[in-house]
Design a protein with these regions (language model features):
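Beta-strand-turn-beta hairpins that frame and shape the catalytic cleft
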Residues: 1-4, 90-96, 172
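Conserved beta-sheet core of the metallophosphoesterase superfamily
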Residues: 106, 112, 146-204
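Divalent metal-coordination and catalytic microenvironments
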Residues: 8, 37, 52, 62-63, ...
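Active-site environment of divalent metal-dependent phosphoester hydrolases
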Residues: 10-14, 40-43, 66-69, 90, ...
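Short hydrophobic-aromatic micro-motifs
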Residues: 5, 59-60, 95-102, 159-161, ...
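Active-site-proximal loop/helix segment associated with metal-binding centers of metalloenzymes
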Residues: 81-87, 92-152
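Catalytic-core regions built around general acid/base machinery
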Residues: 48-55, 78, 82-85, 149
Length: 209
């Protein structure tokens, strides 16, 4: 079984279909884990949800997903129910999956019992200080003591996340950042954990020769 993690899709069904093809994804053999923000901004949010549901994907919830659910913007009630079941954090023995980031003061036990007040941090953070206080704005880049949240991350498991298109794809011993700005004309990125391999497709399909 391969665990395949996918960056922010934002309603871009066509690049998602190409990525699935590049991955040679097989339902029942592979497992797909989108890192949230499946909807909004792109041209076919409903199509993205439908495709992911058909593939039995296991997303975490993103800030735009939450906004659409709260505003009742998803026309299909069954797809809305499917999306609403997505957790804020998904845990594996070796990995933590979250849309935006992990608070510096959260423990492994806290991750298993997140409060409603924790959801905003997990789905929105980019910068914070060592206490988890966020700046008023993430742009322009805030001055110290505010740093990228993972500078203060101390748990042992690697974190897979999205949310941060300006940061783009980034990989270190502690994190895998997967939002490569597909909806802005960048790329859609997947990371295959068992192979430690990255697969990307451009936002726009290359012209046919």
């Amino acid at each position: 079984m391969r665990r395949i993690f996918v960056g922010d899709i934002h309603g871009c069904r066509e690049p998602l279909e190409r990525l699935i093809g590049e991955l040679r994804f097989e339902v029942g053999h592979d497992e797909l884990y989108p890192v949230g923000d499946l909807v909004a901004k792109g041209p076919d949010s409903l199509g993205v949800l439908s495709l992911l549901a058909d593939l039995h994907a296991n997303p975490v919830i993103g800030n735009h997903d939450l906004a659409w659910l709260r505003a009742d913007r998803i026309e299909s009630k069954s797809l809305a129910r499917w999306l609403r079941q997505s957790p804020v954090v998904r845990e594996f023995e070796d990995l933590i999956v979250v849309h935006a980031g992990i608070h510096p003061q959260w423990s492994d036990r806290r991750l298993a019992q997140l409060a409603a007040s924790d959801i905003a941090f997990a789905t929105n953070v980019r910068y914070c200080d060592e206490h988890g206080v966020r700046p008023h704005s993430d742009w322009p880049v805030p001055d110290p003591p505010f740093l990228p949240w993972d500078k203060f991350y101390r748990l042992r498991r690697r974190v897979v996340f999205g949310h941060w298109a300006r940061r783009g794809f980034d990989r270190s011993d502690r994190v895998i950042a997967l939002d490569s700005g597909c909806v802005y004309g960048g790329a859609l990125t997947a990371w295959i954990a068992e192979e430690d391999r990255v697969v990307q497709v451009p936002a726009m399909a290359p012209p046919r020769s």
